[in-house]
Amino acid sequence: MESWLIPAAPVTVVEEIKKSRFITLLAHTDGVEAAKAFVESVRAEHPDARHHCVAWVAGAPDDSQQLGFSDDGEPAGTAGKPMLAQLMGSGVGEITAVVVRYYGGMLLGTGGLVKAYGGGVNQALRQLTTQRKTPLTEYTLQCEYSQLTGIEALLGQCDGKIINSDYQAFVLLRVALPAAKVAEFSAKLADFSRGSLQLLAIEE
């Protein structure tokens, strides 16, 4: 995906259902480790809760390698899965949902739990503000000092930026560009430098 929506700010929704209190929290989490860290922070804030059920889409919305969920002691399939279904249906990426349940003494039944957990995430998503993320790919570029201002202007035209500059006899730049703009920038760079400059991919 060239770009996707991510949470712009965290959301908290509190609901009481049959004497149980459900607290739904959404947050931006860039990657699985960030998702796990957010879950642990919620556990620390609510140590006395009966359940801390979880779902995350930790990468791009279509990245199935970064999905996760947990029922945390609720009957299998009644919490994490309906929560994840809501997240996946939203089209938002890099997002984690935690629903904290303080048990009130009344059983909700399987259908009631699915509705409570999925419904809590649905309510929170309706309150969520988002922003668009365009991932950037990094390259190196070697240029003369006299070419630097022109390169900065070209990067600006292509939504790119300079990550790092190393000033020696020449300038070694580390630049970042959206994938969709690389061909355009390369063409502009060739025109600007009369073919003497080119982007070099960074080997992992």
Regions found by a protein language model. Name each.
Residues 79-127:
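Active-site beta-strand/loop microenvironment that shapes enzyme catalytic pockets
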Residues 141-160:
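Short amphipathic alpha-helix segments
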